[in-house]
Amino acid sequence: VVFGREIIEVATFRGHHPNQDEEAKDNLSKQSDHGQLLRDNVFGSIEEDAERRDFTVNAMYYNIADFSIHDFAKGMQAIEKREISMIGDPATRYREDPVRMLRAVRFAVKLGMKISPDTANPMYELAPLMANIPSARLFEEVLKLLLSGQGLETYKLLNEFNLFEQLFPQLGPLLKTQNSRELAFIEQVLMNTDNRINSDMKVTPAFIFAALLWYPLEERCQQHMVEGGLNHFDAFNLALSDVLHRQIQRIMIPKRFTITVREIWQLQQRLPKRYGRRAFQMLEHPKFRAAYDFLLIRGQIEGGELLTLAQWWTDFQNVDPEERQGMLQVLREKEGGGAPKRRSRYRGKKKAAQ
């Protein structure tokens, strides 16, 4: 409702579904073969609305007339027990809207509660129902889950219920390997993101998506090189498009973010190339900072040459222009003279004038 210059959100009481004859007549509600609600414009009383809520802690109403709280589903008791409990049969409610599984996880982490056993148990079996949710809706849900300032704990709980691989199917095989560099990388990125959010620093969803899909990208690149006989440059760019295309089938990442994801990935290939003016040009790139932060985490997890490269870029940013030239000179000497010189074009000997 528009009230002056403000927009006030108004919630409508929802009622129970009518029988089949009424449904066909009024076309107010509709369910899929999986039991998912496709249309739900059934209006009702406050008591019916309370029964339609997902969790008991969500079925409380504040009356501004007498400042009282109407608790229809023992929500206060659930708060005291620090427990997220479903209203009604959990399996049926999850089938009606599988996103409720994500909401259960999000509320549990956000409120510091546990999910009751009756509410949690069906999630293991019903997690694949997430495939029936529109990809555009899942994008918004993922932002709520991972950009809440508690993304790491949310990820761990999603993974416990096999929900994370439903959101990122290409990560499925990697999530089953304990103590791997892939899992360490994901957890470090989420930890860093949580720290930035909790410090009121700017974050972009593109960085999260770039990190979550980095190792599927590397794996796909290797497949193209081995099976297709492509060089690394062509294989990498083909894999880049493949991985993003597959992910967008599940989560509709807007183009403004996929462009940044591509740039972060592509700059990982350019950061090792520091000869001539390339290092200075790299500093001026709009996405250098994001790509540099990405490289730092890769180096922290994988070590070796990546860690050395990340440290070089850290030092290069912190010294004055004269010292930067010195760093490049040392690099050229260390690499045996630097990048190969451009070959002059052979023109052949001039013929003598006759």
Q: For each of these PLM feature ranges, what is it?
A:
Residues 1-354:
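Catalytic cores of the polymerase beta-like nucleotidyltransferase superfamily
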